[in-house]
A protein has these predicted regions:
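Conserved short strand/loop->alpha-helix "switch" segment adjacent to the catalytic nucleotide/phosphoryl-transfer site
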Residues: 44-56, 60, 88, 127-176
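ATP phosphate-binding glycine-rich loop and adjacent ATP-lid/helix-beta elements
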Residues: 202-230
């Protein structure tokens, strides 16, 4: 299919990172920018580094707002759903989209400030599960996650913490959930989520489905991570990955 002349191309990457470029019709790409006096596009003038940075920041802000809106819509639909399973699935979707929206606010040119993302999400996780008597502690070393991995890591963290809060503090028992993200001596990073709940048999088929391990293992493979789970005096999930 031939390329249109002077076409405006927008592509959203796998991690919600928005890149927009202009094609000049001769095979060369030039950074897009607006007219000084209006909102149109001008191909005759290059943008300065400061203008590019401001545009990128604006795009991140708009993407975050869009994801938060989708999260709110999913949550509203879950409240109107008649079937409990439908409500559960829509709530899960709302939580996942909301987490990605929060992640967008911490993207920089160098990567995603994952510690700042976790700091923002911690009170949200506590509030979502306020009916459970859970003590949630999150610690994270200063880590910049690349765009190619940040969204996947955010979804894994969201899933593991959600599971720990639901199952580790089941039957209205008080519980403790510890989350830790840091670097290992070999240069790799690890994410550890542990609870002091009743535990379970990870080899049991019903347990794999119940805890959504299929989802976490699938995402772990996307970041070439090594995921492991132990159940002794609670459950400890560990993901070792490279950045």
């Amino acid at each position: 299919m031939p390329r249109p002349q002077n076409g405006f191309f927008c592509a959203i990457g796998a991690n919600s990172w928005l890149f927009c470029r202009l094609h000049d019709g001769r095979g060369a790409e030039k950074p897009f920018h607006r007219h000084r006096g209006g909102g149109g596009l001008d191909m005759g003038e290059e943008r300065t580094d400061g203008e590019v940075a401001r545009t990128a920041s604006e795009l991140r802000h708009r993407m975050a707002n869009t994801l938060q809106l989708l999260s709110a819509l999913s949550r509203m639909r879950s409240q109107r759903a008649a079937e409990p399973e439908t409500r559960r699935q829509l709530t899960w979707m709302a939580d996942a989209i909301g987490s990605l929206g929060a992640l967008e606010r911490h993207r920089t040119e160098q990567g995603v400030n994952f510690a700042a993302y976790l700091q923002e999400m911690t009170p949200i996780w506590r509030r979502r599960h306020s009916s459970r008597q859970a003590e949630l502690t999150v610690t994270c070393e200063p880590i910049l996650a690349p765009d190619t991995a940040a969204s996947t890591l955010a979804l894994i963290t969201q899933e593991l913490i959600g599971n720990a809060l639901v199952y580790g503090c089941a039957d209205d028992r008080p519980g403790r959930i510890d989350v830790r993200v840091g670097r290992l001596e070999d240069g790799r990073c690890e994410l550890v989520v542990s609870d002091d709940g009743p535990g379970f048999d990870p080899s049991a088929p019903e347990a794999r489905e119940r805890f959504g391990l299929w989802f976490v293992r699938s995402l772990s493979a996307q970041v070439r991570g090594e995921f492991s789970l132990t159940s002794t005096q609670g459950v400890t999930c560990r993901l070792v990955f490279s950045l």
